[in-house]
C-alpha cells in the first residue's frame, strides 16, 4: 500500500475512534460522582423509562443522577439492569442488541471500589469507560518481527469475522487486569499460563467516539507477549475462527482496512510505533 494512502487511512481511523464531542452531553452521576456521560436522546428515554434516573438543572449545568434510594452497589446494579433489559426488549438502542451477559464495574477512578456494575452492551448508553486487555503476540526471526493475528468468529455479536489481537477481552466485574490477561490468553488462544505470564505491560490506549446516540469510551491495557517459533495458538472458547502469523508489513496494511477491528487496530498501531516500524514522518 502506498505510504500516502496508508497515512490518510490511519488519520481516518483516528478521527473515527476519537469523534466524541461533550457539547450537549449530560454528566451521569452516582452518589454525586460523575462516572459517565449521556446524550440528550438517551437521557430522554431513560427518564421516561424509570424513576431511578433524575434530571437536575442548576446554574452550573444539568446532570443525570441515579437515585440515592439505591444505597448499595448491588441495588444499583439490579435496578439499572432491569431498565436496560426492558429497553433491549423494546429494541430501543442498537448497542443493546450486542448483549453479552457480562457485567463491567462502574467507577470514578480505576483504583476506586465500584459504585455499580453494568451490562457491557449498555455501557455506551451511560457513557461509562470500559476497560480491556489487548495482547500483542509476536516473534522474532532475525531482524524481522512477525505478529499473530486472530480472525473473530462469525457468531460474535460485535465485529464478527474481523481481524483481532492474539488475545483480548474486557475486564469484567470483580476481575483484575493481570487476571484478565491470563484468562483471555488461555480461553481465546489456548496459551498456557507458563507462557502467558511472560506478557509485559506496554502502556494504555484510550479512545472515545459517538455512534447512534451512544458514547463509547474505552481504556485498553496493552501487553506485549513474545512467543517462541514453536508456539502455535489454537481457538479455545469459540470466539476465534483461526490465527495467522504475519510480517509487520502485512499487519501494517491490514489495520487500515475495513477488515480489522478498529479498537484493536489502535493498539496494534501503538505496537508498530513503539517497535520502530512506523517512522515519525509517516
Identify the residue ranges that each predicted region occupies.
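N-terminal leader/linker segments that precede catalytic domains of diphosphate-processing enzymes
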Residues: 1-162, 170-186, 191-240, 248-260, ...
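Short aromatic/basic micro-patch
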Residues: 245
